[in-house]
């Protein structure tokens, strides 16, 4: 099963304690009564997640592996984690969006993310629940969050 953008927001907000956001969202696809509103708002307020455009979050859409990497990278930085190693030997590294390359290199170097069996990263593929849970867990371990 793939993870929707709003589901990823909930997983990360809960895992790392982002809550009580005061920021109102400008996304037309996020209503205050939606179950995910507070999670998206908390991550937006902390500079961790952005919409697909200024007025659209992308509710109901699968999160890509590269977008998840960016969100986890920003989460780590917000938690004060300093990345020391980088790894960019994925066979499809050139297919990773420029905005996500630093995140992918850093998370791979920290062993938070790994590639597919064929050595690729598959940046535009949807992140599965298993992949997302493993990445969140690995990040929690390295920043000494409660697991």
Language-model-detected regions and their locations in the chain:
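Catalytic cores of secreted/periplasmic or lumenal enzymes
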Residues: 104
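Feature responds to low-complexity, polar/acidic, surface-exposed segments characteristic
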Residues: 1-6, 12-39, 45-101, 114-127, ...
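Short intrinsically disordered, low-complexity segments
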Residues: 131-137
């Amino acid at each position: 099963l793939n993870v929707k953008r709003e589901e990823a927001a909930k997983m990360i907000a809960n895992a790392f304690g982002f809550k009580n956001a005061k920021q109102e969202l400008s996304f037309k696809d996020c209503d205050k009564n939606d179950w995910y509103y507070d999670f998206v708002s908390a991550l937006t307020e902390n500079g961790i997640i952005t919409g697909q455009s200024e007025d659209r979050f992308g509710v109901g859409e699968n999160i890509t592996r590269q977008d998840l990497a960016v969100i986890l990278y920003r989460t780590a930085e917000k938690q004060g984690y300093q990345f020391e190693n980088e790894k960019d030997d994925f066979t499809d590294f050139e297919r990773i969006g420029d905005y996500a390359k630093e995140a992918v290199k850093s998370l791979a170097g920290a062993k938070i993310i790994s590639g597919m069996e064929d050595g690729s990263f598959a940046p535009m593929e949807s992140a599965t629940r298993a992949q997302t849970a493993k990445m969140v867990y690995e990040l929690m371990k390295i920043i000494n969050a409660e697991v």
